[in-house]
Amino acid sequence: MSLSRRDFMKVVSSTAVATGLIGCGSDDNESVAVSFEHGVASGDPTQTQVIIWTRVTTAASYVDVSWQVASDIEFLNVVQSGVFTTDTGRDFTVKVDVQNLNANSQYYYRFMVGEMMSEVGQTQTLPEDGVEKASMAVVSCANYPAGYFHVYREILNQHEQSPFDVVLHLGDYIYEYGAGGYASEDAAALGREPSKGTECITLDDYRKRYAQYR
């Protein structure tokens, strides 16, 4: 349904930084800092399923992340929930394919590690039958050193006035160039120099670049 970088609530997701101490990881690490620094996101909906995502920032070896999906923003009616174990092998990302949802319905979702909680995201499943029309926002080519990232705020502002059904990213969500690469002439002045400063080659390079964009 929706993927975005920071502020969305309806078709995209919201972000916040929550930090605290919680027991996780190994027996030798009784309490470690945990935070949700990369927000939450949802996407790839069907009539009965949707994927929800987040990333945990921590020094632990692994983290058990609880997740909930509810029909109301107060989470008085939780319809699906579970626990997802994430670790360094997946860069502490959490990706859950939530199933057995109702068609054409809005849902709220969140993630928790102990008492620490992510921001609440909002998503929607597809309708059962065809629709006569749909409203969408389309974005593409998000080059960190030169991209017009304020467009995401503008989409949110427009959405609050006239809701979009979907936000569609056509591609080039990140660019792998290093410092001095394509369209990076003003990167230093804008405070948007690419992470690491070199072209992305390794898996770790790409993980850091995606984290920088988000």
Language-model features: locations:
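N-terminal export signals
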Residues: M1, D7-G25
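Intrinsic-disorder/low-complexity linker and hinge segments
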Residues: D27-N29
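Divalent metal-dependent phosphoesterase catalytic cores across multiple superfamilies
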Residues: S31-R214
